[in-house]
UniProtKB/Swiss-Prot annotation:
Protein name: Potassium/proton antiporter CemA
Family that this chain belongs to: Belongs to the CemA family.
Cellular location(s): Plastid, Chloroplast inner membrane
Gene source species: Jasminum nudiflorum (Winter jasmine)
Membrane topology: Multi-pass membrane protein
Annotated InterPro entries: CemA
Keywords: Antiport, Chloroplast, Hydrogen ion transport, Ion transport, Membrane, Plastid, Plastid inner membrane, Potassium, Potassium transport, Transmembrane, Transmembrane helix, Transport
GO cellular component terms listed in the entry, alphabetical order: chloroplast inner membrane
Length: 229
């Protein structure tokens, strides 16, 4: 009976982790063709913001310069000039197709994120009992660990999140979140978040160590500072 009570929260935790991902993946696979067809037939204009327009314009100018340089190196003839115009036209269409596909993927990502949020909200509303059991199991597991293991785990986690090499990881993660939620890649915004978010986390961690760990387990704080030094 005790094993069954322990197994139910673990099964619940597994469903929290994998069910939103599985439903989102199934939704993406089943709705991709419909969204693509709707977007290609229902949209008569291409919607671009300033960042997207600047990016496409820069790529187009770069492409045009490369093709012109290629033609300058080769023989000048009317046929080659016609081929140059055809090449620019084809590459322009390709750029528009890529932008169109990015917009479709943005719609799909945004839809799947909304679905995942709704599912997780349902878990938090209707699964209070299971969440309480999971919380108690997690606290019991952490309580049984030695202070050395706890200090090492905290140090490892902080080095991964706010260590010397963490900005690159934060940049990739924030860029991925930007893409998933349909935002356009913005280097300035991402750089600002990368430079401020780890600092905020570091401040919160120090506050937590000072207010909570000093009161609950002073020996853990001593071991943590010894390892950190």
């Amino acid at each position: 009976m005790a094993k069954k009570k322990a197994f139910t929260p673990l099964l619940y935790f597994a469903s929290i982790v994998f069910l939103p991902w599985w439903i989102s993946l199934s939704f993406t696979k089943s709705m991709e063709s419909w969204v693509t067809n709707w977007w290609n037939t229902g949209q008569s204009e291409i919607f671009l913001n300033d960042i997207q327009e600047k990016s496409i314009l820069e790529r187009f100018i770069e492409l045009e310069e490369i093709l012109l340089l290629d033609e300058m190196i080769k023989e000048h003839s009317e046929t080659r000039l016609q081929k140059l115009g055809i090449g620019i036209h084809k590459e322009t269409i390709q750029l528009i197709k890529i932008q169109n596909e990015d917009r479709i993927h943005t719609i799909l990502h945004l839809s799947t994120n909304i679905i995942s949020f709704v599912i997780l909200s349902g878990y938090s509303i209707f699964g209070n009992e299971e969440l309480v059991i999971l919380n108690s199991l997690a606290q019991e597991f952490l309580y049984n660990l030695s202070d050395t293991v706890k200090a090492f785990s905290i140090l490892l986690l902080t080095d991964l999140c706010i260590g010397f090499h963490s900005p690159r990881g934060w940049e990739l993660m924030i860029g991925s979140v930007y893409k998933d939620f349909g935002f356009v890649h913005n280097d300035q915004m991402i750089s600002g978040l990368v430079s401020t978010f780890p600092v905020i986390l570091d401040t919160l961690l120090k506050y937590w160590i000072f207010r909570y760990l000093n009161r609950v387990s002073p020996s853990l704080v001593v071991i943590y500072h010894s390892m950190n030094d």
